[in-house]
């Protein structure tokens, strides 16, 4: 795997609070190697490990993007939803930021069928295809289209399973992680002090509740994806 300098700065991580963990009573003992100390009944993460795993994750997505791999970013809680969407759009990734639908990946045949319906209804609406229906029928179709937009808007251009999935909140995205593990899709995930680092392929010890830490880590990953994509398109 390519090893590059991604300009990961410990002072920058401290400034946005990447090191702040949860209350000590909520911890997962599997996170012990990544905890620096306790402070006022809260755990403080060791940012040396954060920098190490973030660098590894950047190298991994860079190599993937360089080979034309497809990425998905998952962040459905309110602290992560906007960041997930903005990052995905910046790097042309798929994203889920509303709700993870059970079976989205493991039942890909059904997801694919819904995506096709979404595509057809969108085309019909944009070309005046709803005009031939009664008001009631058109209203039903519009509601169906809005529901598909809410559920699948971030993956509307997906034609196959993603190659790499970036997850911003392990505790809230267990279903997504389980589906990725079932299918053998590599995962990169922020892991706070209450998480299980063994559930994902590349855990990044970090505060997963603050918008600042989430944005900082995502920005590094997106930078790496875009750098890899540039090389891919130059081939």
Swiss-Prot record:
PROSITE patterns: RIBOSOMAL_S2_2 (PS00963)
Cited Pfam families: Ribosomal_S2 (PF00318)
Cross-referenced InterPro entries: Ribosomal_uS2, Ribosomal_uS2_bac/mit/plastid, Ribosomal_uS2_CS, Ribosomal_uS2_flav_dom_sf
GO cellular component: chloroplast; mitochondrial small ribosomal subunit
Assigned keywords, A-Z: Chloroplast, Plastid, Ribonucleoprotein, Ribosomal protein
Protein name: Small ribosomal subunit protein uS2c
CDD domains recorded: RPS2
Recorded GO MF terms: structural constituent of ribosome
Compartment annotation: Plastid, Chloroplast
Keyword Plastid among record annotations: yes
